[in-house]
């Protein structure tokens, strides 16, 4: 992957710093929610649905 940055460029956060991070929750099926609402990546959601049907309803993949 050419767009990945080296791990040397990142700083590890301690628990106090991690508590200050503001973000949302990703559900793994194309749905991402924050405090202001949820959004859907429809391409990923469709793909997750197809995979779920192919697996007999077992999980997202």
From Swiss-Prot:
Job description of the protein: Active against L.monocytogenes and several lactic acid bacteria.
PROSITE patterns listed in its UniProt record: BACTERIOCIN_IIA
The protein's name: Bacteriocin leucocin-B
Keyword flag Disulfide bond: yes
Residue span(s) of the pro-peptide: 1-24
Pfam entry (one): ComC
UniProt record, GO biological process: defense response to bacterium; killing of cells of another organism
Organism this protein belongs to: Leuconostoc carnosum
One GO molecular-function entry: pheromone activity
Disulfide bonds: 33-38
Matches recorded under InterPro entries: Bacteriocin_IIa, Bacteriocin_IIa_CS, Bacteriocin_IIa_dom_sf, Competence_ComC
Annotated compartments: Secreted
UniProt keyword list: Antibiotic, Antimicrobial, Bacteriocin, Disulfide bond, Plasmid, Secreted
This protein's record includes keyword Lipoprotein: no
Family: Belongs to the bacteriocin class IIA/YGNGV family.
GO cellular component, one term: extracellular region
First-listed, main subcellular location of the protein, grouped into a coarse class: secreted
């Amino acid at each position: 992957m050419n767009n990945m940055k080296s791990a040397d460029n990142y700083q590890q956060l301690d628990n106090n710093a991690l508590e200050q991070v503001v973000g949302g929750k990703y559900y793994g099926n194309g749905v991402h929610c924050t405090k202001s609402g949820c959004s859907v990546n429809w391409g990923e959601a469709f793909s997750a649905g197809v995979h779920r049907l192919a697996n007999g309803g077992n999980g997202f993949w």
